């Protein structure tokens, strides 16, 4: 059910080096960013908007009936971009929960977007995110696959203790592939973007470590599959096959 207190923001920019113009690449007859927008709308959890500094992206989204907010071009991260967008879209501070959905997840399922709200039912949780169990050694050892190490709270829930590109944790038992979808309480997002980059964040190149180093609580919902991000031409062709393009 759509909540007026929830805002889904999709940060999108044209600066990808491996896939120039990535948000506007065609997948099954729609620009990639519009495919993501459609999935966020289908999740029916709140208002949905694209946050961008690119007029081309804004034009494509509005041409397909989506909402856009223009942001500055100099943001160091998607979190900073969505915070500016939140301030623009909600000056009266009625929004309580902000979802940060990457614009290169065209195959994400609407129910996975909604799943990120689950951990926020606990008022002690500042930030929610998702992960799926790793089933292959190739995935476990790939430094481009971010692993979340967490303390189990339930069969489908972890409390995050660390995120790493290394193969971890050691020993027998499941390992989890982190999915870059976040749900923030508004106050948590405000606090997060005000913090300077942290030592472990800079070392691992993972901005969520900034929150953990500051003592913020991140809980993780476990889902069955990892949505395929689009970072390479091969990823793009896979997404086109999945979506019938």
Swiss-Prot record:
Any one Gene Ontology BP term: lipopolysaccharide biosynthetic process
Source organism, top-level taxon: Bacteria
Catalytic activity, EC: 2.7.7.38
GO MF terms, alphabetically ordered: 3-deoxy-manno-octulosonate cytidylyltransferase activity
Any one of the GO CC terms: cytosol
Catalytic reaction equation(s): 3-deoxy-alpha-D-manno-oct-2-ulosonate + CTP = CMP-3-deoxy-beta-D-manno-octulosonate + diphosphate
Subcellular location: Cytoplasm
Keywords of the record: Cytoplasm, Lipopolysaccharide biosynthesis, Nucleotidyltransferase, Transferase
Gene3D superfamilies: Spore Coat Polysaccharide Biosynthesis Protein SpsA, Chain A
Listed InterPro entries: Cytidylyl_trans, KdsB, Nucleotide-diphossugar_trans
Pathway listed: Nucleotide-sugar biosynthesis; CMP-3-deoxy-D-manno-octulosonate biosynthesis; CMP-3-deoxy-D-manno-octulosonate from 3-deoxy-D-manno-octulosonate and CTP: step 1/1; Bacterial outer membrane biogenesis; lipopolysaccharide biosynthesis
Primary localization: cytoplasm
Family from the record: Belongs to the KdsB family.
Summary of the function given for this chain in its UniProt record: Activates KDO (a required 8-carbon sugar) for incorporation into bacterial lipopolysaccharide in Gram-negative bacteria.
Name of the protein this chain belongs to: 3-deoxy-manno-octulosonate cytidylyltransferase
Annotated gene: kdsB
